[in-house]
Amino acid sequence: MKDFITEAWLRANHTLSEGAEIHLPADSRLTPSARELLESRHLRIKFIDEQGRLFVDDEQQQPQPVHGLTSSDEHPQACCELCRQPVAKKPDTLTHLSAEKMVAKSDPRLGFRAVLDSTIALAVWLQIELAEPWQPWLADIRSRLGNIMRADALGEPLGCQAIVGLSDEDLHRLSHQPLRYLDHDHLVPEASHGRDAALLNLLRTKVRETETVAAQVFITRSFEVLRPDILQALNRLSSTVYVMMILSVTKQPLTVKQIQQRLGETQ
């Protein structure tokens, strides 16, 4: 008999930030209230089995295998971007830019994907290295980075997504006025700040590097911005990690709820 996942279990085990993706055991099913909660938060639901295969429910709520990044169950024929011809056998010098298009591995867009991939890897490592208070933050950061990768791969707009309930505007305000909202002024990283701040600073600088590479790819020579959504998302992620660094060095770090209260009081 399949286990049912309840609304209470979801709230206890996931941040449920709007626009994120969650993976649930393949042998589980959602109670009506749990499904309603996920749909209200616009979450993508995937089920994962013991072999790591991912599934989504079809209209009859039957599991259908899908690609981990694109959520697609189709395998279209890929064509070379240069010659527009189908690629029957992929050479080592070409790779997928999308499911339908292959490009040379020297393509700057692949350079952006590679740096983004490294940033995701570092975020996952910090999920292992850092203590429980940072886990909701890091889970949402990892999710946001994955959604950036997905939006770029599919050529789709990047939707809004809060980090631990904090909006892009909230994070912008916090990172620009930390003394006002977080009880600690701006900081320049140093060893005395401790291990957490040092590890978070690695992630912050990696996100900034990803943002600058994205700018090289998505801002044309005539200053046309091709993906303002991706550039803003990376900028706000850098702000997010900076806020985490400041919280890590304060003597009595505020909770997310306390931060939200302060933000609300000054609106």
Curated annotation (Swiss-Prot):
Cofactor note: Binds 1 divalent metal cation ion per homodimer with both subunits providing Cys ligands; Fe(2+) gives most activity and is possibly the physiological cofactor.
GO CC terms of this entry: bacterial microcompartment
SUPFAM superfamilies per record: Cobalamin adenosyltransferase-like
Biological process, per Gene Ontology: cobalamin biosynthetic process; ethanolamine catabolic process
Amino-acid positions noted as binding a divalent metal cation in the UniProt annotation, renumbered to this chain: C80, C83
Keyword Nucleotide-binding tagged: yes
EC annotation from Swiss-Prot or TrEMBL: 2.5.1.154
General function of this protein: Converts cyanocobalamin (CN-B12) to adenosylcobalamin (AdoCbl), the inducer of the eut operon. Is not active on cobinamide nor other intermediates in the adenosylcobalamin synthetic pathway. Allows full induction of the eut operon.
Name of the protein described by the UniProt record: Corrinoid adenosyltransferase EutT
Origin species: Escherichia coli (strain K12)
Lineage, uppermost ranks: Bacteria, Pseudomonadati, Pseudomonadota, Gammaproteobacteria, Enterobacterales
UniProt gene name: eutT
